[in-house]
Amino acid sequence: MFHQIWAALLYFYGIILNSIYQCPEHSQLTTLGVDGKEFPEVHLGQWYFIAGAAPTKEELATFDPVDNIIFNMAAGSAPTQLHLRATIRMKDGLCVPRKWIYHLTEGSTDLRTEGRPDMKTELFSSSCPGGIMLNETGQGYQRFLFYNRSPHPPEKCVEEFKSLTSCLDSKAFLLTPRNQEACELSSN
C-alpha cells in the first residue's frame, strides 16, 4: 500500500513538474521550406551568428575565440547550391574570411557541406523575428546555432534559444560577445 501511494505521489509530482518546465517535442521544431530542389530566397542575404548550444563545451570550442561572425547566403550556380561567405571577427581584432558551399539533398531538408561529407546541417524556423536555427552534426559533434538578421536581437530570443536547446540535451551554451564592429564581408 505504501509503495502505491508513493508511486502515485511521484507520478503527480512528475505531471506538475512537466507542466511547469515544458519542453517542446522534436516534432515542434519546424524545418524551413527547403524542398531539396532549390533554396528559398527568403533565407538568402545577411545573417549574424548570435549563439550556440551543444551537449558539451568541446563541441562549441571553435567559437571561443570569436567576437562576432557575419554571413551572407547567396544562391549558387545550380538551384541546389547555396554559397556561404563569412567574415569572422576574432576577439583579438583579426578578421578571418571563410567560404563554403552547401548542397541541398533531394527529397530532404538536409544541407551537405562541400568537402565535408561527414557534416549535415538542418535549418529550423525560429519564433524570433528575423531568426533562424541550424542543427549541425558531424563526426563527433552536434551543435545548434542561432542566427539573426540583426546583430543584437531581443534578449527574449536568446533566452528562447537557450531554453529550447536545453530541452534537446544541450548542456553547454555560448553567446558571442559582439563587442567589436563586424568585419566587412568581401564581395568575392
Curated annotation (Swiss-Prot):
GO terms assigned for molecular function: lipid transporter activity; phospholipid binding
UniProt cross-references to Pfam families, sorted A to Z: ApoM
GO CC annotation: high-density lipoprotein particle; low-density lipoprotein particle; very-low-density lipoprotein particle
Glycosylation positions in this chain: 135
Disulphide bridges, residue numbers: 23-167, 95-183, 128-157
Keywords: Disulfide bond, Glycoprotein, HDL, Lipid transport, Secreted, Signal, Transport
Family per record: Belongs to the calycin superfamily. Lipocalin family. Highly divergent.
Oligomer and partners: Interacts with LRP2; LRP2 mediates APOM renal uptake and subsequent lysosomal degradation.
UniProt-recorded name of the protein: Apolipoprotein M
